[in-house]
Each structure stands twice: as C-alpha cells, then as structure tokens.
From Swiss-Prot:
Phylogenetic classification of the source organism: Eukaryota, Viridiplantae, Streptophyta, Embryophyta, Tracheophyta
Biased composition (Basic and acidic residues): 358-371
Organism superkingdom: Eukaryota
Protein name: Inner membrane protein PPF-1, chloroplastic
Topology in membrane: Multi-pass membrane protein
Keyword Transmembrane: yes
MF-aspect GO terms: membrane insertase activity
Biased composition regions of type Polar residues, renumbered to the chain: 414-427
Lumenal side: 1-108, 205-296
Induction: By the plant hormone gibberellin A3. Expression is induced to a greater extent by short day conditions than long day conditions.
Residue ranges with Basic residues bias: 431-442
BP term (GO), one: protein insertion into membrane
UniProt keyword annotations, A-Z: Chloroplast, Membrane, Plastid, Thylakoid, Transit peptide, Transmembrane, Transmembrane helix
Amino acid sequence: MAKTLISSPSFLGTPLPSLHRTFSPNRTRLFTKVQFSFHQLPPIQSVSHSVDLSGIFARAEGLLYTLADATVAADAAASTDVAAQKNGGWFGFISDGMEFVLKVLKDGLSSVHVPYSYGFAIILLTVIVKAATLPLTKQQVESTLAMQNLQPKIKAIQERYAGNQERIQLETSRLYTQAGVNPLAGCLPTLATIPVWIGLYQALSNVANEGLLTEGFLWIPSLGGPTSIAARQSGSGISWLFPFVDGHPLLGWYDTAAYLVLPVLLIVSQYVSMEIMKPPQTNDPNQKNTLLIFKFLPLMIGYFSLSVPSGLTIYWFTNNVLSTAQQVWLRKLGGAKPAVNENAGGIITAGQAKRSASKPEKGGERFRQLKEEEKKKKLIKALPVEEVQPLASASASNDGSDVENNKEQEVTEESNTSKVSQEVQSFSRERRSKRSKRKPVA
C-alpha cells in the first residue's frame, strides 16, 4: 500500500489536517482517503464566533482542485476520469451538442490518420459553426450598412429641427419607414449567434477540464496547457508565466515561448482586422472614444488567452480570421446588399418625409393643362354655334370628372367652365345680331 503525503498551507494559524492518498496496485480504480487529525487544533470552546466560514470553504475548494491535479500528475499510467463540472446553465444543451460534434470530428480525423486530430477538429468545428451563422451575419452587416448610409439624412433632419426632439424622432421614424430599415435589425442576428458561441466555448472548456486535450498541436506542447484546473479556478491562470523560479519560468523557456506564440498571433490578427475594417475618420468625439477603446481591446483578449487552455485560443484565432474574411467579403467585395445604397438614392430629403405617402406630381403637368384649356378656347371661338354647344357640354363633363378625381383643381375647373360658357353665349349673340341685320337677296 503506497501513501503519498500532500502538504498544504496553514489553516487558521495551524496546519491543515493530514491528507493521505492510498492506491492499491491490484485494483483498477483510484481512491482518495482523507484522514483528519485534530490534535493540533485549539479547543472548540476557544474558537471565536467571528470565524470567516466563506474563507474556509474557499481554501477547502482550492485544496480539492489541487488534489485533483496532483492525482492526475502523480499516476499518469492510471487513466482515471476526472469528473469535470459541466455547468452549462441556459446553454447547456448547446454545449453538450458542440462537445459531441467535436468528439465525432476528432474520431473521424483520427480514423484517417490525420495528425493533431484534436487541434484540427477544433478548427473544423469553428469553420462549420461560422458557415452556419453566415446568413445571420450577412443580415446584420446589411442592416448596419443601411444605417450608415442613412446617417447624412438623419444629420440633416437633426440640423433642420434642432431643439425639437419630438419632431426629430417623428421625421427619423418616417425616414426609416420609407427606406425599409429597422434600427434593431442589426442587433437581432448578433444576439441570435451569442448562445452558439457561448455553447462552443463551454464545450471546449469541458473537454479541457476532462483532460482530453492532452495532445499537442504543431508547435504547441499541449492543447490543455499551459494552465491547470486549479489555477483557473483560483484565478491565477498565468501562474505558469509569473513569477519566475530560479530565474526562469515554471515550464522552462522553450515551452513558455511555444505557448506564447499563439496569444501573440491572436493579438496581431485582432489589430489587422481592426485596421481593415476601420471606419472613415470623422470629427465625432464619440467615434474617437470608441476607437480608443478598441485599440486596447486586443491586448485584453491576448492577456485573457494566457489563462485558458491553448485549445480555446486556437478557436479564438480561427474565429477571428474567419470573421475578418467574412467582413471583407460582405463590406468590401459587395457580398452584402443593403436596402439603402451608399448615396441614399431614392430617399427623400430632410423635412419632407411627411409627403412620402402622396404621389409626386409630374413636372410640367400644370403647364400642359393650361395649354389644353387655351386650345379649347380658340377652338370654341372658331366653330359655329351649332357645334359649340356639344363641345361645351363635353368639356364641362370632362371638367366635372377631373374635379371628382382631384379636389385641389375644383375651383380652377369651375371658373374655366364658367368662362367658356360666357364666351359661348357672347359668341352666339354676335352671330344672331349679324343674321338679323342681313337683308334678304332679291
């Protein structure tokens, strides 16, 4: 019977109880027996009531994670299953499905003798998920581009109705309605893809916690490294890098440099993506503040990648490269078809949105109407009385139909009709007077 003593830090001023792990070579399972010895603890009645129980539980939990890591490292030959805590929460079913697909891809690549099967399975799964969410990404980019193309119109409305927020909101809403743009359409696809990526992240975390990411990938010593379960749970995920031990990192210079290459590539890819997709420079102070924050965002992501398994960093790097390629295709190469073009062609000018429902009047229409009326007048003057009456009645009927179709021209048409009738009457009186003056021919 072999026993391994694991030392622990002081606990409430006294050492923690002795912990012994027993292993029987004749058994295939691994047992952990904890022996408590209270001979070093003070009497119970002398313990103060202000003991920090939360601190006790936190240290005990950290100790259990340390024991889990020590058990795996002490006896690698005994392939025991480490019980990982799979707390998927609301996205547990998504993470379980992603984990199943990842294992299927890994087994499929291993069956065809592909080296680094787990690393390539992570890359392949990221590509599949990215391709599946491409329609949502395309919809989000199209909505974003349409909103950007409408910004000049929106600014014109704000300048025209400065100080009247209610009118600005009304005109802006009408502008969105006419352009067929929904301001919230750009957010919905992004919100729909968030559970997918959270599930994929949790699936990779579960695989790492289960100890399945033990194989390397290209120059990376292990996809599960460089951190450990205990370091991640205690919040000291970069303890493998700092502090130095005897003047060198804990893992040695070679492995440490190998693990640092991928976070550096991740940071570089983030900056390249930001430079490619950088919006045009403006004098807007809000945009300048946003760009300033984005400059430090890749550094934060790179720092966070130091405290997670390398398998997750591979997923982040692959996802970032694919996202950049998608954005270039959608924005630069014409893959996205926004509802509003770059010049906002066909959209009304600021302050005229209230006329969008009415049909615009054709240019020169009123001039043509006046010319037709003038021709009618000349024709009536040139015709005899017998032909004037039916023409006048026809013109009156036409004028009446026009009045019914267009209320705005009612007064004009009635006045024109009255003028025509007066001219006809005067013309007929003149003809009668001339006939009466004629003498009969002998």
